[in-house]
């Protein structure tokens, strides 16, 4: 693994005083310890970092598609969760040029994806501090354990940045684990004629001297894997769903095919609000952009990304994630079924509410194998329990999606429709803009359905190995 080290000489005592004034935490008798790399995620042990919580990312980027060169300044505002002598950020590749903490030059070194920062003085527990990283280079494409690609992905006329599960570290430094959510402000400068599309609301768009700067704001907390950036030529559509602003950006080659389905975003949002509760964000929309190496859609917050014109099933799935996955975000990657099982069940509910098969019929056909084209596909969903994928390469496999949805149908069978739909809405409301794990979900359901025996649902469908004997 390539290593680089940058050591900065010790600053004079006057700088210590300046640091104390800026941080309200440096020196002053604080004796911290390093925050550490990783947060002990069972599948991505190096993802995220200990000792602090990021509350805001301020990213200022400039991208030259011809040279494939990105220049960035990242300003992270964070709160120390312990006394810190050092802390880590996740950043893959790129050349780090300068790091400051509270405006004071900090020492730093790199090893793989870990950028270790040593502020001039220790940071006290509960103190708010600001770290600024200047960096540049050609961001990398990341290959997942399952073979899919993410990170910084080239398109015909620009790039597409996708982050699930760890790709965002390819284009900005951060605490890249779903358990740390933050607000974002992103300013991106690109050659005139190109658009830069991200999450949240477009605050401004200014062109000068052959370049255009787009400024995006995401006020609601967002896990970094849900951050996106699409640079290229797009057909832009601005509209509203009631009071909610919609912004869609579509590759011109996909515009005609995408228009009929994307035009139904307001309808899907209205239906979703009836089923899942109030929409959790202040804007919505979609991005349709094609990177040759990407064959999947992703629920990037407020603005899902589709690799081509979506159908209704895919649109319903990705918009359902705005409640389940984006607003209620998994505590760790082991809890992915709370994303994908819920979004898959949303597909079943959409069919049920729009003249198609009921969710119970869909469940029965999945259980019998009738809904699959091959016997192999029918057997795949029983390879492991949805709440316990065997490894990082399986967190997006069929059991997480389909068997995860089956768990919800079993809960519905056990508690009845009225209580079940109350649980769906209440779960989204209780953990709105937060994190939750599987134990939180089972406890929540049991609290909402006192006296209901759910042991078999959890033991056989959620955690059990193999195919349960009875549907």
Positions of the model-derived regions?
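N-terminal, polar/Ser/Thr-rich
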Residues: 2, 17, 22, 26-71, ...
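Surface-exposed beta-strand/loop patches in extracellular or lumenal glycoproteins
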Residues: 73-95, 172-176, 183-191, 439
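Short, hydrophobic/aromatic-enriched beta-strand segments in well-ordered soluble domains
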Residues: 74-78, 127-141, 184-192, 214-220
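A surface-exposed beta-strand-loop module
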Residues: 91-153
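Glycine/proline-rich low-complexity spacer/linker segments in large multi-domain proteins
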Residues: 125, 135-184
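Hydrophobic helix-coil surface modules that form long, contiguous segments used
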Residues: 177-316, 345
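Zinc-dependent metallopeptidase catalytic helix centered on the HExxH motif
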Residues: 179, 301-368
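Amphipathic alpha-helical substructures
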Residues: 358, 397-471
């Amino acid at each position: 693994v390539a290593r680089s080290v940058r050591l900065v000489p010790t600053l004079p005592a006057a700088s210590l005083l300046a640091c104390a004034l800026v941080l309200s935490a440096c020196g002053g008798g604080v004796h911290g310890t390093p925050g550490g790399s990783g947060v002990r995620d069972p599948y991505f042990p190096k993802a995220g970092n200990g000792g602090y919580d990021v509350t805001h990312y301020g990213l200022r980027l400039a991208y030259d598609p011809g040279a494939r060169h990105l220049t960035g300044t990242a300003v992270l505002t964070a709160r120390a969760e312990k006394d810190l002598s050092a802390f880590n950020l996740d950043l893959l590749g790129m050349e780090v040029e300068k790091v400051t903490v509270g405006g004071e030059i900090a020492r730093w070194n790199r090893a793989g994806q870990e950028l270790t920062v040593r502020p001039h003085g220790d940071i006290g527990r509960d103190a708010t501090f600001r770290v600024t990283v200047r960096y540049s280079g050609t961001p990398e494409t990341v290959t997942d354990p399952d073979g899919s690609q993410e990170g910084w992905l080239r398109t015909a006329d620009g790039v597409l940045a996708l982050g699930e599960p760890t790709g965002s570290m390819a284009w900005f430094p951060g605490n890249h684990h779903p358990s740390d959510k933050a607000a974002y402000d992103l300013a991106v400068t690109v050659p005139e004629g190109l658009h830069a599309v991200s999450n949240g609301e477009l605050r401004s768009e200014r062109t000068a001297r052959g370049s255009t700067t787009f400024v995006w704001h995401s006020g609601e907390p967002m896990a970094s894997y849900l951050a996106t950036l699409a640079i290229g030529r797009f057909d832009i559509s601005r509209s509203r769903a009631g009071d909610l602003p919609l912004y869609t950006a579509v590759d011109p080659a996909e515009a005609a095919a995408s228009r009929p389905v994307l035009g139904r975003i307001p309808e899907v949002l209205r239906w979703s609000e009836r089923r899942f509760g109030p929409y959790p964000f202040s804007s919505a929309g979609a991005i349709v952009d094609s990177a040759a190496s990407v064959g999947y859609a992703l629920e990037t917050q407020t603005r899902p990304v589709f690799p081509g014109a979506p159908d209704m099933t895919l649109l319903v799935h990705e918009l359902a994630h705005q409640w389940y996955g984006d607003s209620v975000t998994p505590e760790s990657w082991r809890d992915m079924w709370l994303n994908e099982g819920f979004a898959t069940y949303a597909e079943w509910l959409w069919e049920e509410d729009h003249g198609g098969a009921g969710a119970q019929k869909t469940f029965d056909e999945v259980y019998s194998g009738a809904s699959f084209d091959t016997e192999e596909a029918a057997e795949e969903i029983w390879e492991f329990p949805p709440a316990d994928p065997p490894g990082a390469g399986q967190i997006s496999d069929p059991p997480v999606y389909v068997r995860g949805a089956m768990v919800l149908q079993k809960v519905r069978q056990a508690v009845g429709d009225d209580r079940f739909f109350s649980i769906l809405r209440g779960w989204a409301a209780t953990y709105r803009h937060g994190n939750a794990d599987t134990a939180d979900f089972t406890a929540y359901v049991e609290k909402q359905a006192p006296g209901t025996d759910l042991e078999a649902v959890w033991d056989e469908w959620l955690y059990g190995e193999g195919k349960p004997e009875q549907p």
